[in-house]
Amino acid sequence: MPKLYIIAGCNGAGKTTASYTVLPEMLGCKEFVNADEIAKGLSPFNPESVAIEAGRLMLQRMDDLLSEGSDFAFETTLSTRSYVKFIERAQAKGYFVTLLYFWLPTPEQAIERVATRVREGGHNIPSDVIRRRYANGIKNLTALYIPLCNYWAIYDNSSADEQIRIIALGGKDITTHIEDTLSYKTVSYTHLRAHETLAN
């Protein structure tokens, strides 16, 4: 059975860093499709200028890998519904879809993480964009993507010592197991609060 891994979380959550460890060492997945890395390849000194082209190339590569039936992973903030149909297509082709979500407790921590990345030479993302993606990502995580994926896990990646903690896991045929009740309730509460904010 081919495998699709979705590495998700807000900007600054440590998705890319975690994926380079988790994917090859723990999951045996060598193919990681990342629009940010594609953009760096196209324009190393100004990756933001080629973001649209990088996104297009990312989607094309994902389609190619899906057609080949290869195992692969991609990175996303889940801030839009755009991957729902792609996941459904993958499952129709027999893929087992795993969602790994790296969570930060607040958008402020995400903003600070991105600011640190910029100071170290990384690419910038405006604070208002980070806040919007943070709220939309958690809303879509709970409302759309968790019910859709075959297996999911939420991790707390907020620790300064880079220790990733499991919050909860579950799946279509897996009973939900909550390891950190307080954090899991916080994720759920953040989703409800984000839904109210977006509705107003």
Predicted regions and their residues:
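Conserved small/polar residues in nucleotide/adenosyl-binding loops
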Residues: 114, 190-197
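A glycine- and Lys/Arg-enriched "phosphate-lid" helix/loop adjacent to the NTP-binding pocket
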Residues: 95-144
